[in-house]
C-alpha cells in the first residue's frame, strides 16, 4: 500500500503541509497517491538518526553488512508485480524495462554484498618503519579505507530502480558502512516508497540500527538543499543534470565543513521528429523511445 509518507528511520512520517502527485505519462493523468513533502523537523530527525546509527553501523562486520544487502534484494524481489506496476504507472516505461531494471538493481545489491564480504574494498596498506635508515629514519605508515558517515543520495529521474532508492549509490554507501538518506525523485515517489519499505524491512530482519536508512519526499529543491547543508551529512551521491549537480556541489563546498559530491552529470539529448513521421508513426515512435 502506498501511504505517501516519508520514512524517518523505520517509522512512517507525514508532518509536512505540502503534498503532490506523481504523473502517469502513458495515460496522461495524475496518479492517485498524495505524496507528503518532508518538513524541516523530519529532515533534522533523519539526519540525527543517521548520525547515531553510524556509530554502530560503521563497526558492523562485512559479513553482517552483506546479509543486510542481500536481504534488501530479497525484499525488493518479494514485492513482485505490484512494484513493477507502480514503476510503470510513474515512468510510463513497459513491463520488460521494469523487469530488466529491477534485475539490474538486485544484481548490484548482491554484487556489493559479495564485495564487502570479501573485505578487499578496505585496500589496507602497511609500510613498515625503518628507524635505522639514514640520514632520516622512515616512519611506519598504515592506510585503510573507512566509512565517511551518513550519505545523502538523490534519486535519478530516468532510473527509478537502478539509480535511485536502492540503486548503485545506496548499495555502495551501505556496503562501505555509511547510513543513507534518500531524497526521492518526485517523478517516482511511490515507487521509492515501496523500495524504501523493502530496505526498512531488511534492516529490521538483519538487526541494523534504526536510522541506517531514511527516505524523504519533495517536489522542489528545498529538502535537498537542507540535507546537503546539514552538518551531520558527510557525502552526497547524485545522478542528473549538470545544472543540478553543480548546484549541489556549490552548496557542499560552501559548508563550514565541505563534503564530497559524487555526481554523474549529463545533458538532455535532442530528439528530432519530422512531421510526416510523427503523423504516420506517432505511437510506435513513442513506444520505441520509452522502451
Describe the predicted segments one by one.
Residues 1-136:
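N-terminal Rossmann-like NAD(P)+-binding subdomain of aldehyde/semialdehyde dehydrogenases
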Residues 28-29, 65, 87, 177, ...:
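Residue-level signal for inorganic ion chemistry
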Residues 109, 192-195, 227, 248:
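Hydrophobic packing residues within well-ordered alpha-helices of enzyme cores
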Residues 123-206:
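Conserved small-residue-rich beta-alpha loop and adjacent elements
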Residues 140-141, 214-237:
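A structured beta-alpha segment of the ubiquitous adenosine-cofactor-binding alpha/beta core
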Residues 176-181, 207-210, 228-235:
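Short, surface-exposed connector motifs at secondary-structure boundaries
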Residues 182, 215, 238-240, 261-264:
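General beta-strand structural signal in soluble alpha/beta enzymes
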Residues 198-201, 244-291:
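ALDH superfamily catalytic-core signature
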